[in-house]
């Protein structure tokens, strides 16, 4: 561990409120927030897991979380099968990937906030998914948060693994359960958010791309295409 940013915290996680029923909650413990300097791990930019010396390191929100992405092919609650072959050796890098790195929600909520701690390291190379080349707004969001003149942006393919001689890695600032091993299990410990990081992220993006705050819309509708998860009234809104 290179540096502890925040200590372990506790908070109450509430389930969805139902009529005529008491709103249940569960007290959760958030792991401390740390910056790690790791030598010679094997990474895949589409996985939040780190592989080193035959072991997988992954911060689960609960034991029912499924995280077989990137080079993690299969796992249960104890063991995992991982692809440990790598395509390239990288000298040094700040890890800006993770489960769902191609997904705007995970990218915005879980991955981008880590740029706010980039200056806590001396690393000048950022490792990020090459998906930002396909989605201009993803790249623009990154540009709003860092000064590209000071850093080298190394784009990594999700289908490839890499060995990094010195990896700077931040554990989860904000965490959302990626998927479930057993979808029938309904649990309350499915995520947490550190709101101060989200506020800082929001302010940086607004200051970069919105000149007149008075012109901001109160509500924003996200148009989803090429997916089955489309709002029923989408055509009416468009």
Regions found by a protein language model. Name each.
Residues 1-238:
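The feature primarily captures lumenal catalytic ectodomains
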């Amino acid at each position: 561990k290179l540096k502890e940013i925040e200590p372990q915290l506790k908070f109450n996680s509430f389930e969805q409120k139902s009529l005529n029923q008491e709103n249940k909650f569960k007290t959760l413990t958030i792991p401390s927030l740390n910056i790690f300097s790791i030598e010679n791990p094997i990474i895949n930019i589409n996985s939040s897991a780190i592989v080193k010396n035959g072991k997988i390191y992954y911060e689960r929100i609960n034991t029912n979380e499924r995280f077989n992405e990137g080079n993690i092919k299969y796992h249960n609650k104890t063991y995992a099968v991982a692809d440990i072959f790598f395509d390239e050796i990288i000298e040094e890098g700040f890890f800006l990937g993770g489960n769902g790195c191609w997904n705007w929600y995970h990218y915005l909520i879980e991955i981008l906030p880590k740029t706010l701690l980039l200056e806590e390291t001396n690393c000048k190379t950022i490792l990020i998914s090459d998906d930002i080349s396909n989605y201009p707004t993803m790249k623009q969001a990154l540009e709003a948060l860092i000064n590209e003149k000071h850093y080298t942006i190394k784009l990594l393919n999700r289908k490839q693994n890499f060995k990094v001689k010195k990896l700077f890695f931040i554990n989860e600032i904000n965490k959302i359960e990626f998927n479930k091993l057993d979808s029938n299990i309904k649990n309350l410990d499915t995520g947490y958010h550190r709101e101060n990081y989200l506020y800082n992220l929001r302010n940086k993006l607004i200051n970069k791309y919105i000149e007149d705050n008075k012109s901001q819309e109160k509500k924003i509708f996200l148009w989803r295409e090429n997916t089955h998860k489309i709002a029923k009234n989408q055509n009416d809104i468009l």
